[in-house]
Amino acid sequence: MCYNAKNEVIALKKIIVSACLLGENCKYNGGNNLDAQVVEFVKGRDVIPVCPEVLAGLGIPRITIELKDGIVTRKDGVVVDEAIRKAVTQILAQVKEEDIECAILKARSPTCGVHQIYDGTFSGTLTDGAGVLAQALLDAGYIVWDNEDLEETQ
């Protein structure tokens, strides 16, 4: 369930979800992060799948990216921050147009992580913080959960 700022359950009709959680093969390695609990939760709802990294033109498969000091960079050192932020802006416009109240995004992703992301050293080390899309949605006042939040409530 998703809750508003008053901790009231809201009835969700339209929701954005990280496409990889729905089984779309859009991960950096060409795979997915299919999450059966997410799929079950969104049954009967109008779902808009999103992948900022694909929308940014990074391709499938692609070189991994991480967020360090607010800049999105590939493992090979190429900065892709502008492309990611442009994709996030497009997603935000769609969210507003579609009147979406809630998002369920992929935990720890550099674009979609809500509570923690990898620290930008490409060493597998986590740090507190949100990915670019998650932070933009939170800043705009949307309810944003990651898939692990959903698992904790069920």
What is each residue range found by the language model?
Residues 90-121:
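N-terminal glycine-rich phosphate/adenylate-binding segment common to multiple enzyme folds
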Residues 9-10, 25, 55, 65-67, ...:
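Divalent-metal-activated hydrolytic enzyme cores
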Residues 20, 106-109, 149:
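Short, well-ordered beta-to-alpha junction loops that form the rim of enzyme active sites
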Residues 11-15:
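Extreme N-terminal starter segment of soluble prokaryotic enzymes
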Residues 23-30:
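Short N-terminal binding/cap micro-motifs at the start of the first secondary-structure element
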Residues 33-74:
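Short, surface-exposed acidic-centric catalytic microdomains
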Residues 3-8:
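Short, positively charged and aromatic/hydrophobic N-terminal segments
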